A protein has these predicted regions:
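Short, intrinsically disordered N-terminal pre-domain segments
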Residues: 1-6
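Residue-level detection of beta-strand-connecting loop/turn positions
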Residues: 7-9, 110-112
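Short, surface-exposed, charged amphipathic helix/loop patches that serve as local interaction elements
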Residues: 14-103, 114-206
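Acidic surface patches and DE-rich sequence motifs
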Residues: 107
């Protein structure tokens, strides 16, 4: 993600949990307000700018950001683009995986792991988190939400790696979201494969 301030361009790099936390807190607090109000207070705008500064790793100060984003629309737009960037990175990872069809593979610490069969026990752990977090109104995730996703990933992969190892590997928030969503994609892919194989068991058609 890029931003231009006072004729200088900056890149955010990975949007880590530390960077994301401030943004998520501000986004959630303003989301409800946005439904009932069409304006933002000075404090609201300050918090948006602070979140932008943090997402860009404090490469510029609050004052520099506030001066560079000299229109209200610029503050709101660049703040909103943070979520768009995360979704864009998630989509890029999905496109790369679609090329390889490796929906049951995750790389942790330079090593590839396969999820193996997803039975009821593993599926239950995933489903509980999925049902709580994947809803139309859910736009951001707390640290606890992200922890739950990572724990579900670890369990789906039969604890072949630890939570700590997975959390270190999935440093970008988009990586956590993507690999969690990939679990469902893998189940759907396996269903399609099994359905294709099962056709030979159907009665012959006249």
């Amino acid at each position: 993600m890029k931003i231009s301030l006072n004729n200088k361009e900056y890149e955010s790099g990975k949007i880590t949990r530390e960077k994301y936390k401030k943004f998520a807190e501000v986004y959630e607090s303003l989301l409800g307000k946005e439904k009932t109000a069409q304006t933002f207070s000075d404090d609201d705008l300050d918090r948006m700018v602070e979140a932008i500064v943090q997402v860009f790793g404090n490469q510029f100060t609050f004052e520099e950001a506030d001066d560079g984003l000299d229109e209200i629309s610029s503050i709101i737009l660049n703040f909103s683009l943070i979520n768009a960037e995360i979704m864009n990175n998630t989509n890029i990872q999905a496109e790369e995986t679609a090329k390889t069809l490796k929906t049951n593979i995750i790389t942790v610490g330079g090593k590839e792991y396969e999820s193996g069969k997803i039975g009821r026990k593993k599926y239950r752990a995933f489903r509980e988190v999925y049902d709580d977090l994947v809803t139309p109104e859910k736009q951001t995730y707390t640290d606890d939400d992200l922890d739950r996703m990572v724990k579900a990933i670890v369990e789906i992969y039969d604890n072949q790696f630890t939570f700590k190892e997975a959390n270190a590997e999935l440093a970008d928030v988009s990586q956590i979201i993507f690999n969690f969503a990939l679990i469902n994609a893998n189940i759907i892919k396996r269903l399609a494969e099994q359905a294709k194989d099962a056709k030979k068991n159907l009665s012959s058609q006249v």
